[in-house]
Amino acid sequence: MAAATDGGGLPLLADKAASHSHHHHPERHFTSGEVVRDVIMGVSDGLTVPFALAAGLSGASAPSSLVLTAGLAEVAAGAISMGLGGYLAAKSEADHYQREMKREQEEIIAVPDTEAAEIGEIMSQYGLEPHEYGPVVDGLRRNPQAWLDFMMRFELGLEKPDPKRAIQSALTIALSYVIGGLVPLLPYMFISTAQNAMLTSVGVTLVALLFFGYIKGRFTGNRPFLSAVQTAIIGALASAAAYGMAKAVQTR
């Protein structure tokens, strides 16, 4: 069905806009995807790895003090390692963006007509005709910086990274890992018997995994309850494997 138009052939959107203002539809978007990804990565590994380590040591009949010492050492090492990994990943992403931007800038200067034609190809993918995107192409050619930004985003699919992203990513992942890693170790700080501490750690950590999985599902758009169950199962399997392996080695 054709849209109603005015004398100039443009769709009449005024009534729609007015109606929309009266029937506002709240859009639920979360734009800080990189931060959420870092937190998920840090907390997820922080909950799982020390949990599995503590279960394995408990299975080997290690005392609570040893489990706690080894667990804290692992949390410190894991936080540093994951933080550095996040820093290097973000730094590599920023370096890649700079290289591609330099190459694209050189192409705009060397072969402007070819690059302008690529704008048209991109626009045509959205259903626009040459007479519709022609003025856009002309406007971008008059503004080299806007042209470069357009090509980076729509041709290469690259967003300009935040200059502080590498440091922020490292700190976010490391801190999240520490927070997650302390959860399964808390019982060992207060319970002297390793077996009792392990059972308490299992209960506390599984609750934390369920809660974290639910929150993760809410932020990532997945089904929260399914995400909670999946996260808890992964943590439980990791700790069970470590505990079983320790018991198997101990009996040899």
UniProtKB/Swiss-Prot annotation:
<feature type="transmembrane region" description="Helical">
    <location>
        <begin position="171"/>
        <end position="191"/>
    </location>
</feature>
<keyword id="KW-0812">Transmembrane</keyword>
<dbReference type="Pfam" id="PF01988">
    <property type="entry name" value="VIT1"/>
</dbReference>
<feature type="region of interest" description="Cytoplasmic metal binding domain (MBD)">
    <location>
        <begin position="92"/>
        <end position="167"/>
    </location>
</feature>
<feature type="topological domain" description="Cytoplasmic">
    <location>
        <begin position="87"/>
        <end position="170"/>
    </location>
</feature>
<feature type="binding site">
    <location>
        <position position="107"/>
    </location>
    <ligand>
        <name>Fe cation 3</name>
    </ligand>
</feature>
<comment type="similarity">
    <text>Belongs to the CCC1 family.</text>
</comment>
<feature type="topological domain" description="Vacuolar">
    <location>
        <begin position="192"/>
        <end position="196"/>
    </location>
</feature>
<feature type="binding site">
    <location>
        <position position="115"/>
    </location>
    <ligand>
        <name>Fe cation 3</name>
    </ligand>
</feature>
<feature type="topological domain" description="Vacuolar">
    <location>
        <begin position="60"/>
        <end position="65"/>
    </location>
</feature>
<feature type="binding site">
    <location>
        <position position="104"/>
    </location>
    <ligand>
        <name>Fe cation 2</name>
    </ligand>
</feature>
<feature type="topological domain" description="Vacuolar">
    <location>
        <begin position="246"/>
        <end position="252"/>
    </location>
</feature>
<feature type="binding site">
    <location>
        <position position="115"/>
    </location>
    <ligand>
        <name>Fe cation 2</name>
    </ligand>
</feature>
<dbReference type="GO" id="GO:0005774">
    <property type="term" value="C:vacuolar membrane"/>
</dbReference>
<feature type="binding site">
    <location>
        <position position="118"/>
    </location>
    <ligand>
        <name>Fe cation 3</name>
    </ligand>
</feature>
<keyword id="KW-0479">Metal-binding</keyword>
<feature type="binding site">
    <location>
        <position position="107"/>
    </location>
    <ligand>
        <name>Fe cation 1</name>
    </ligand>
</feature>
<keyword id="KW-0408">Iron</keyword>
<feature type="topological domain" description="Cytoplasmic">
    <location>
        <begin position="1"/>
        <end position="38"/>
    </location>
</feature>
<keyword id="KW-1133">Transmembrane helix</keyword>
<feature type="binding site">
    <location>
        <position position="104"/>
    </location>
    <ligand>
        <name>Fe cation 1</name>
    </ligand>
</feature>
<feature type="transmembrane region" description="Helical">
    <location>
        <begin position="197"/>
        <end position="217"/>
    </location>
</feature>
<feature type="topological domain" description="Cytoplasmic">
    <location>
        <begin position="218"/>
        <end position="224"/>
    </location>
</feature>
<protein>
    <recommendedName>
        <fullName>Vacuolar iron transporter 1</fullName>
    </recommendedName>
</protein>
<dbReference type="GO" id="GO:0005384">
    <property type="term" value="F:manganese ion transmembrane transporter activity"/>
</dbReference>
<keyword id="KW-0472">Membrane</keyword>
<comment type="function">
    <text>Vacuolar iron transporter involved in the transfer of iron ions from the cytosol to the vacuole for intracellular iron storage. Vacuolar iron storage is required for seed embryo and seedling development. May be involved in the regulation of iron translocation between flag leaves and seeds. Can transport zinc ions from the cytosol to the vacuole.</text>
</comment>
<keyword id="KW-0410">Iron transport</keyword>
<keyword id="KW-0926">Vacuole</keyword>
<keyword id="KW-0406">Ion transport</keyword>
<comment type="subunit">
    <text>Homodimer. The dimeric interaction is mediated by both the transmembrane domains (TMDs) and the cytoplasmic metal binding domain (MBD).</text>
</comment>
<feature type="transmembrane region" description="Helical">
    <location>
        <begin position="66"/>
        <end position="86"/>
    </location>
</feature>
<keyword id="KW-0813">Transport</keyword>
<feature type="binding site">
    <location>
        <position position="118"/>
    </location>
    <ligand>
        <name>Fe cation 1</name>
    </ligand>
</feature>
<feature type="binding site">
    <location>
        <position position="151"/>
    </location>
    <ligand>
        <name>Fe cation 2</name>
    </ligand>
</feature>
<feature type="binding site">
    <location>
        <position position="155"/>
    </location>
    <ligand>
        <name>Fe cation 1</name>
    </ligand>
</feature>
<dbReference type="GO" id="GO:0046872">
    <property type="term" value="F:metal ion binding"/>
</dbReference>
<dbReference type="GO" id="GO:0006879">
    <property type="term" value="P:intracellular iron ion homeostasis"/>
</dbReference>
<feature type="transmembrane region" description="Helical">
    <location>
        <begin position="225"/>
        <end position="245"/>
    </location>
</feature>
<dbReference type="GO" id="GO:0030026">
    <property type="term" value="P:intracellular manganese ion homeostasis"/>
</dbReference>
<feature type="binding site">
    <location>
        <position position="115"/>
    </location>
    <ligand>
        <name>Fe cation 1</name>
    </ligand>
</feature>
<dbReference type="InterPro" id="IPR008217">
    <property type="entry name" value="Ccc1_fam"/>
</dbReference>
